């Protein structure tokens, strides 16, 4: 779903483990690392979209996590023109971010729950390192999400 300004409505997921590390996935067949995220469907709530993306991208369900917090407003970023294909009015992503606590064992994480997986590798990483490792155009949103949700981390 794309809004009137060309931004795709989206949810982002920050999944933390018991060591205060965050899940970070490498996009399949690319050297690009990011948090799980994905577009909302028409009339889909933020929470339902987040749980759908969590299942599709890393194989987790409601029983595997606890919602700790979420951003109160949309955070957005523009995708560089060199990444865009075609002539649509699409500009970037507009996201609500969720902070989740992972309460199961790592074995529960499954990157192959769909016929088109998003990630081919993953790791637990410090949040600050995730900001450094992601695409530059996304790092601002990662910083904003952390700023708003950081009180829940410690």
Model-derived features: positions:
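Acidic, metal-coordinating catalytic segment for phosphate/diphosphate chemistry
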Residues: 1-18, 87-88
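Active-site beta-strand termini and strand-to-loop segments that position acidic
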Residues: 15-18, 27, 100-102
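A conserved beta-turn-beta hairpin within the catalytic core of GNAT-like acetyltransferases
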Residues: 29-31
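A short gly/proline-enriched turn/hairpin at secondary-structure junctions
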Residues: 34-38
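Unchanged
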Residues: 40-135
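Charged phosphate-binding loop/patch that engages nucleotide di/tri-phosphates or the phosphate backbone
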Residues: 127-154
